[in-house]
Amino acid sequence: QPLSETEFGELDDFLANEANEDRSMDVSTLEGFLTAIAIGPRMVPPSDWLPWVWDMEGGEVEADFASEAQASRIMSLILRHYNNVIHTFNTDPASFEPIFWRGIQWGAAEWSEGFITGFMFNEDAWSLLSMGQPTWFTPFLRLGTDEGIDITKSAGDAETWMNGIEPALVRIHAY
C-alpha cells in the first residue's frame, strides 16, 4: 500500500529532525535512492542500503531514534515505500510518478541526487548499462549533480529533464 501524504510527512519530519538532518536523506532523496535500488541490475538487501539513508556521506552513522516504537514505525514506512516502488515497477512501470510531482516541498534535484547515490552505491552492476545507454541517465545527471544543475539553470530546461525521468526509469527497468 502506498504511503499517504501524512505518512510521507511523518517520515520527512523524522529525517529532518535535529539529530538526523545534517546527514540523512530527505523524503525526495530517499525515494530516488530507493528507486535506483529497486530497479537496479542486482538485488541489494536492505541491511546494505539502509545505513545510507541515515548517513548519505558514508553509510556509517546510525539513525537517532527516540524509542524502539519510533524505530519500528520509521523502518516500516521506509520498507513499505521501497516495496511499493518495487511493486509499481513490476506491475505497471509507466504508472510510477516520482514524489517531486506531488508538491514543491519534494525537489527533483534531491530526487535525482538520491537516484545517483543508489546508482553509485551499486556502481559495478550499473556500469555496463550506463556505458551502453548514457542518455538514459542524463535526466538524473542534469538535475542531481552540481555541474548538471549549473547547466540546467543556464539553459532554463529543468522541466524538460524532470519530464524525462519517468521514461528513463521505464527504459532502465526494462533493460
Residue ranges and their predicted role:
Residues 1-112, 116-175:
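Domain-length accessory/inserted modules outside core catalytic folds
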